[in-house]
């Protein structure tokens, strides 16, 4: 959503305060991270991550409909930004848990592989590097897409990529692989 401030400014003729208010629905879901954590504990990190990418697809595609300086489009934008924030919060919590699970699994397979202190800090460091790379690459790609073909193309591409990630998560899930072997 790195191009969001510029899009909101040009579409809705908003100033800094109006643009800042757009971030309220985007970040509100992060206050429910403890509930999301409970859901991850109950259903598993991969299922919650899959759900997050599935939520990404419609909200990205529906952002194409936000095109005019009308109350309807502003309300639609705020609703879609809430779902964008929800998907982001789901992914953040679930992926952090997944990092921990991978480290624990590797340490069980090969005790001491990460040294005396374990590999959790190193794994979170790598997670942070990957996340930061996305935070750099995402705005560059989004900006390029908006300049090249416009807002609708940018949100469509991000929706398609999210759909692709959902497919990858679904087909690589242990539950799906087991069903394929049984069938």
Where are these regions (language model features)?
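Short amphipathic helix-loop junctions that connect adjacent transmembrane helices
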Residues: 2-17, 104-105
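Intracellular juxtamembrane helix-capping segments at the cytosolic ends
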Residues: 4, 90-114
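Short hydrophobic/small-residue motifs within alpha-helical transmembrane segments
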Residues: 26-28, 132-133
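Helix-to-loop junctions at the C-terminal end of transmembrane segments
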Residues: 32-45, 146
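Cytoplasmic membrane-interface "Motif A"-like loop-to-helix N-cap segments
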Residues: 42-56
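C-terminal ends and interior cores of transmembrane alpha-helices
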Residues: 54-71
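Hydrophobic core of transmembrane alpha-helices in multi-pass small-molecule transporters
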Residues: 74-91
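A membrane-interface helix-boundary motif in multi-pass transporters
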Residues: 141-162
């Amino acid at each position: 959503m790195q191009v969001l401030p510029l899009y909101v400014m040009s579409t809705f003729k908003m100033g800094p305060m109006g643009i800042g208010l757009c971030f309220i629905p985007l970040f509100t879901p992060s206050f429910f991270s403890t509930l999301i954590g409970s859901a991850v504990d109950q259903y598993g990190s991969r299922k919650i991550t899959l759900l997050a990418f599935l939520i990404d697809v419609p909200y990205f595609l529906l952002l194409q409909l936000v095109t005019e300086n009308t109350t309807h489009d502003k309300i639609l934008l705020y609703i879609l930004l809430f779902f964008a924030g929800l998907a982001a919060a789901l992914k953040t919590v679930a992926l952090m848990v997944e990092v921990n699970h991978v480290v624990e699994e590797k340490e069980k397979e090969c005790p001491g592989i990460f040294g005396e202190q374990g590999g959790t800090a190193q794994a979170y460091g790598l997670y942070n590097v990957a996340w930061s790379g996305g935070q750099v690459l995402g705005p560059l790609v989004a900006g390029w897409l908006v300049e090249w073909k416009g807002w609708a193309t940018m949100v469509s591409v991000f929706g398609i990529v999210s759909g692709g990630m959902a497919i990858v998560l679904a087909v690589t899930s242990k539950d799906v692989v087991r069903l394929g072997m049984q069938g």
